[in-house]
């Protein structure tokens, strides 16, 4: 069996799809379906069972057995960078992750988890080293602290433990994310409503490492298949502009004039204006597949979003 926490969410459901593509259907999805719309991410996928996240962690703490587990992909977390309830974030993202990590270590189950580029904060160097890490929000701090915890444990770990610092992920199965969905998703919706696509004023100076979710899932699967341990950036290695995203959306639809809107006050000083993954460490594992450019990935995503 393979366990995917957050399996009804954005990246988790894409990992389930990648596992299905390998012929694996013996998958336990763990999630919180209080937002019932997330079920749609699983409708076209095959899984063996579903478990609520609170019931699951209670079983983990109790030491219950789930049979033979080939791997755990831990994608479940509060991923809202705008959430400021630190007690909630640390319980949900940090304590939960530690319990699951130790369960896997005790049983030598390969453990792959979602970290984040939010661990870096306001830096121009995105390398997996302590000197470049300075998160700007409590979400980023929760991910950073778990990475630090993992770093201390890795030398003694007898089974793979692997964290991925996701950069700006976009693509299919993010519809439920609301305001936290990708720029491409929001621009597509604006055009469908007959509006012009909108970018924040000043965003011409912002550049992000936008990475297609299919590529993210592929790296997760490859690292599992190859027994990789460590903490790795997962982006494309190239920063592209928000304008490049908007241009790709407009090109797909064949209409729309890009407008600018004021930059939100609540995001000032808490917003990463630039991200670009240093992929040196990931490439050193032997992973050599290319990543989709914004033009390629957004075109594929638009075709998926607007499929009939």
From Swiss-Prot:
Complex and partners: Homopentamer.
Give the superkingdom in one word: Bacteria
What does the record give as its pathway?
Nucleotide-sugar biosynthesis; ADP-L-glycero-beta-D-manno-heptose biosynthesis; ADP-L-glycero-beta-D-manno-heptose from D-glycero-beta-D-manno-heptose 7-phosphate: step 4/4
**What is the role of the protein in this entry?**
Catalyzes the interconversion between ADP-D-glycero-beta-D-manno-heptose and ADP-L-glycero-beta-D-manno-heptose via an epimerization at carbon 6 of the heptose.
* Gene Ontology annotations of biological process type: ADP-L-glycero-beta-D-manno-heptose biosynthetic process; carbohydrate metabolic process
* GO function terms (MF aspect): ADP-glyceromanno-heptose 6-epimerase activity; NADP binding
Identify which top EC class this enzyme belongs to. Answer: isomerase
Q: Which residues bind substrate?
A: 168, 179, 186, 200-203, 208, 271
The molecule here is called ADP-L-glycero-D-manno-heptose-6-epimerase
Query: Could you say which residues bind NADP(+) here?
Result: 10-11, 31-32, 38, 53, 75-79, 92, 143, 169, 177
What EC number is given for this enzyme? 5.1.3.20
Family statement drawn from the similarity comment of this UniProt entry: Belongs to the NAD(P)-dependent epimerase/dehydratase family. HldD subfamily.
Where, by residue number, is the active site?
139, 177
> Entry cofactor note text?
Binds 1 NADP(+) per subunit.
Q: Does the keyword NADP apply?
A: yes
Annotated domain remarks:
Contains a large N-terminal NADP-binding domain, and a smaller C-terminal substrate-binding domain.
* Cofactor(s), by name: NADP(+)
- What keywords are assigned to this protein? Carbohydrate metabolism, Isomerase, NADP
Please report the organism this UniProt entry assigns to the protein. Answer: Haemophilus influenzae (strain PittGG)
Give the catalysed reaction(s), semicolon-separated. ADP-D-glycero-beta-D-manno-heptose = ADP-L-glycero-beta-D-manno-heptose
SUPFAM superfamilies in the cross-refs = NAD(P)-binding Rossmann-fold domains (SSF51735)
């Amino acid at each position: 069996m393979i366990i995917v926490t957050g399996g009804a969410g954005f990246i988790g459901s894409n990992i389930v799809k990648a596992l299905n593509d390998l012929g694996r259907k013996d998958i336990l999805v763990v999630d919180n379906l209080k937002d019932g719309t997330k079920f749609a991410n699983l409708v076209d996928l095959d899984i063996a069972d579903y478990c609520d996240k609170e019931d699951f962690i209670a079983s983990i703490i109790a030491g219950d057995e789930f049979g033979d587990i080939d791997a755990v992909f831990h994608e479940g977390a509060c991923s809202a960078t705008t959430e400021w309830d630190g007690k909630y974030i640390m319980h949900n993202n940090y304590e939960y992750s530690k319990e699951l990590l130790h369960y896997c270590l005790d049983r030598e189950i390969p453990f792959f988890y979602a970290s984040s580029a939010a661990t870096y904060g306001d830096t121009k160097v995105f390398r997996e080293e302590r000197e470049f890490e300075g998160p700007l929000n409590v979400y980023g701090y929760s991910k950073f602290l778990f990475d630090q915890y993992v770093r201390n444990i890795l030398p003694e770990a007898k089974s793979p433990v692997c964290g991925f610092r996701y950069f700006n992920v976009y693509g299919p199965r993010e519809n439920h994310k609301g305001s936290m969905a990708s720029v491409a998703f929001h621009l597509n919706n604006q055009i469908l409503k007959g509006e012009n696509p909108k970018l924040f004023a000043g965003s011409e100076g912002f550049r992000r490492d936008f990475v297609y979710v299919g590529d993210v899932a592929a790296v997760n699967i490859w690292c599992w298949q190859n027994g990789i341990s460590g903490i790795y950036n997962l982006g494309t290695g190239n920063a592209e502009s928000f304008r490049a995203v908007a241009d790709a959306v407009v090109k797909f639809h064949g209409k729309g004039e890009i407008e600018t809107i004021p930059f939100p006050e609540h995001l000032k000083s808490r917003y990463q204006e630039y991200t670009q993954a240093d992929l040196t460490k990931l490439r050193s594992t032997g992973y050599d597949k290319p990543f989709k450019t914004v033009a390629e990935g957004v075109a594929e995503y638009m075709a998926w979003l607007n499929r009939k």
